[in-house]
Amino acid sequence: CWGMQVAVTAGRGAVKKAASSHIGIANQIKMSVEGFKHPIYKNKKDNFNSPAFNFDEVVTLPKNSICLASNKINKIQSIYFTVGDTKVWGLQYHPEITYEKMISLIEFRKKRLIDNRKVFKNEDEIKNHIAFIKDEIAVSNKSQRMLELKNWLDNIKHYN
């Protein structure tokens, strides 16, 4: 997600603190019409969840950008744009990271999430949120969850 935010900033777009955040999971990500056509989402189901951890979001896209997916928290979950000959694919979420790693990150940042970020009121809320993520682990399909990474790797093979 930070990579997309840096690319957007370098491309003269804008990133700001989000009104809400994803803590361990982004729910109900939906592809745009353009997203259905983009190679990053080849064979991907339209409505999906993914590991995510972010407090900031893209609010202004660089010129010639296309929003490929969104959800209720971030209107821009994935993008595509070009800078010269460079093709930029960006994701706000993390298909490359497991939910288990996200749970570890939540546990590691527990005090900050309660005291500083005020995302959770107490440890019980965190435990409930972790249980929610564990429910997702039980129903998610790893190959489907990581498909964007596979599609990106398959695509860059064509440039070598």
PLM features: what roles do these ranges have?
Residues 1-35:
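Cysteine-nucleophile active-site neighborhood
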Residues 31-160:
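Amide-donor transfer/coupling interface in amidating biosynthetic enzymes
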